[in-house]
Amino acid sequence: MVPQVLLFVLLLGFSLCFGKFPIYTIPDELGPWSPIDIHHLSCPNNLVVEDEGCTNLSEFSYMELKVGYISAIKVNGFTCTGVVTEAETYTNFVGYVTTTFKRKHFRPTPDACRAAYNWKMAGDPRYEESLHNPYPDYHWLRTVRTTKESLIIISPSVTDLDPYDKSLHSRVFPGRKCSGITVSSTYCSTNHDYTIWMPENPRPRTPCDIFTNSRGKRASNGNKTCGFVDERGLYKSLKGACRLKLCGVLGLRLMDGTWVAMQTSGETKWCPPDQLVNLHDFRSDEIEHLVVEELVKKREECLDALESIMTTKSVSFRRLSHLRKLVPGFGKAYTIFNKTLMEADAHYKSVRTWNEIIPSKGCLKVGGRCHPHVNGVFFNGLILGPDDHVLIPEMQSSLLQQHMELLESSVIPLMHPLADPSTVFKEGDEAEDFVEVHLPDVYKQISGVDLGLPNWGKYVLMTAGAMIGLVLIFSLMTWCRRANRPESKQRSFGGTGGNVSVTSQSGKVIPSWESYKSGGEIRL
């Protein structure tokens, strides 16, 4: 029995608030007490507010938020960062060209960013070519600077749309907020001076497809509408509702934090700026179905307790606790004073923490002050314990409240480099590290030879150099051939000291050169 009570309180709490769960209901307005007979006891109907007299139920259609609308209001965009790559060249006397690359930032224009984004999305090679380093120019004995502008597109960069004022929220914005995209303002500034944010969709249209039409039953009394039974079967009271626009659509914010758009006859005040609406997701719908089932089950338990009272003709504090109104709204409160059964009209409110109703020992806070007890008895089964502590049977559900809060899920969006809180920007207009991964490496290089001549002069010089080289090679080969010829003759006629015979002009064999000379002189 106790686990079912805890589950009910927990499920009921989830559907009635956003953030911390309400764990109890207690009157914030309590009328005068009057004695009654046990036959006047009744179980509250938590699905329809009978006390307002709106018992006429008629089908109608209304508009509410789509399931998961908070996660659906995402505006996809991109960031555009301007980068200037500078190539500085110096050509020395012998013609060596030294090139040094540097990068700086510049603030881009929205039109140029839109064009670069379209290039990137379409796979246009012009985008990749725009990221290349500039082709350096150089002149002999001069320093020449060549610059090239590039636009770094980083996508996606997802922002959250505030449906109340249509502003955009992201860590990439200064103060994490941008006033929004309009016809006159097509971009948002970022926390980097040389980067702007733009939406993927160039049309300045707010993506507010967050509403859906639902069917329910209107609870009315003549022309007065007190509330309605929603599509899940849970009654929603219009008491305390205020007017609130979401994405330009006028609707009502109910006391439980839900938002609906429906026709009402009465005048309703506007909501203050701090009044927000609750999340609407599949989990809340599922829990609301479970809440309806639990409300029906709790009504059956209340009827069982009431039957026991009628049968035994006796009333206990624990049995009276079953007659408490379980949802905010009008109801009855019961107690026993001096063995007399008492009843009072009450308007119940939700309690999110026990400190709201038990601020100090022995104090049960009702209507802004400590409610007096009669011999340790309050109402609805609430009593004062022997140690002067207020005893509430459902207080043990607070242990499960902490457990349920741990089960709340959160969505971690893509971390844009500008949204990283650890990012530290450099001083001046020096290029940041987050753009380097999108650009070619810059390095210092020595390449090329330049003698200060025009292009045709370079070709003439190269041709002349080639011809001179050929002449030098030919001359060298000729010199080497001439140098080798005398050496070979000396080896042929010098001999090694032995006799060498030659033939004279007369055909006579002469044993040596000297004999040949002698013979010649004799003949003469």
Swiss-Prot record:
TM annotation in the entry: 460-480
Glycosylation site residues: 56, 223, 338
GO BP: any one term: fusion of virus membrane with host endosome membrane
Keyword flag RNA-binding: no
Name of the protein in question: Glycoprotein
Protein purpose: Attaches the virus to host cellular receptor, inducing endocytosis of the virion by using different host proteins including TFRC, GRM2 and ITGB1. In the endosome, the acidic pH induces conformational changes in the glycoprotein trimer, which trigger fusion between virus and cell membrane. There is convincing in vitro evidence that the muscular form of the nicotinic acetylcholine receptor (nAChR), the neuronal cell adhesion molecule (NCAM), and the p75 neurotrophin receptor (p75NTR) bind glycoprotein and thereby facilitate rabies virus entry into cells.
Bilayer topology: Single-pass type I membrane protein
Residues with lipid group (S-palmitoyl cysteine): 480
Chain ranges on the Intravirion side, renumbered to this chain: 481-524
Organism domain of life: Viruses
Gene for this chain: G
This protein's record includes keyword Glycoprotein: yes
Secretion signal, residue range per the UniProt entry: 1-19
Species in which this protein is naturally found: Rabies virus (strain China/MRV) (RABV)
GO terms under cellular component: membrane; viral envelope; viral membrane; virion membrane
Subunit details: Homotrimer. Interacts with matrix protein. Interacts with host TRFC. Interacts with host BST2; this interaction inhibits viral budding by tethering new virions to the cell surface. Interacts with ITGB1. Interacts with host GRM2.
Assigned protein family: Belongs to the lyssavirus glycoprotein family.
Additional remark text: Arg-352 is highly involved in rabies virus pathogenicity. Its mutation dramatically attenuates the virus.
Biotechnology: Primary surface antigen capable of inducing and reacting with virus-neutralizing antibodies. Almost all human and veterinary vaccines are based on the functional aspects of the G protein.
Post-translational changes noted in the entry: Glycosylated and palmitoylated by host. Glycosylation is crucial for glycoprotein export at the cell surface.
